[in-house]
Amino acid sequence: MKGNIYSLFVLIAAFFWGTTGTVQALAPESATPLAFGAFRLLIGGSAMLLAVWISRELHVKNWAWPLVFLAAVCMACYQPLFFTAVKETGIAVGTVIAIGSAPIIAGTLEWAVLKKRPRNSWWIATVLALAGCWLLFSDSSNVRIDVAGVLMALGAGASFAGYTLISKAMMKTQPPRATSAVVFMISAILLTPLLWQLDISWILTPRGLGTSLYIGLIATCAAYFLFAKGLTGVPASAAVTLSLAEPLTASLLGVFFIGEMLSPSSWLGIALMMLGLLVISAAPRKQKTAEAAHMS
């Protein structure tokens, strides 16, 4: 049961992330992907840092600072790559490729670098979810494929996988919420200088401020605190596979709020993705039950 709670934390986080593409589409047209991503980190990172400071969780003694900065670089790269991909190739395709590629990259890195072979449930769930991803955007008459956008989405997927693996390693010895807060604040600092080169007047409009606050406070601060908590109870590769709930959410929001069209095969893809998420969500409980039986 406890393992399923950690999986639920990741799923809720992924749901919030899945709203980012739709929220970006609702932002003013002058809001560039780079500026939107930078404000997301700035607002979200500030809120996270304030929260851990108030709760007195901000203890940074004996931290693995090289890993902290590497995780921050991954997150700083993820923001502009993801939002540009969504703008260039659509909400559904951009999100599906970005997050759909991440489980493969994360599982491969976890196996190659950490010598930790993913569980059988991960393979089954990832195959189901990725097959669902492919079906979700395989009908070219309903979506647009932009090569540059696809490459940026793949880069975003690699950045997210790297962030997850590094965060998982750090959270073995560092407090999850404080680690996430510091990583996001450093990421914001890395991207903030770029704001001076962009037109950011849009954030002073009601739509600009509203979408920025939502993306920073809900889809970043709340979501990544939940994700950090989830990482303490599930493997990094499983967490990234669970994150496939993000494109599932994004696709449904794209249909119901933005007017994007999905074919019957795309709906079949959604069903496969949901099945994959159920498989990986149930895995921690089964593993724990097996361990308990073995100990008895």
Curated annotation (Swiss-Prot):
Membrane-traversing stretches: 8-28, 34-54, 63-83, 89-109, 121-141, 147-167, 183-203, 208-228, 238-258, 261-281
One annotated Gene Ontology cellular component of this protein: plasma membrane
Source organism of this protein record: Bacillus subtilis (strain 168)
Domain EamA: 15-138, 158-282
Cellular location(s): Cell membrane
Stored Pfam families: EamA
InterPro entries attached to this UniProt entry: AA-Vitamin_Transporters, CO/AA/NH_transpt, EamA_dom
Protein family: Belongs to the EamA transporter family.
Membrane-related topology note: Multi-pass membrane protein
Classification via NCBIfam families: 2A78
Keywords: Cell membrane, Membrane, Repeat, Transmembrane, Transmembrane helix, Transport
Listed name of the protein: Uncharacterized transporter YwfM
Lineage: Bacteria, Bacillati, Bacillota, Bacilli, Bacillales
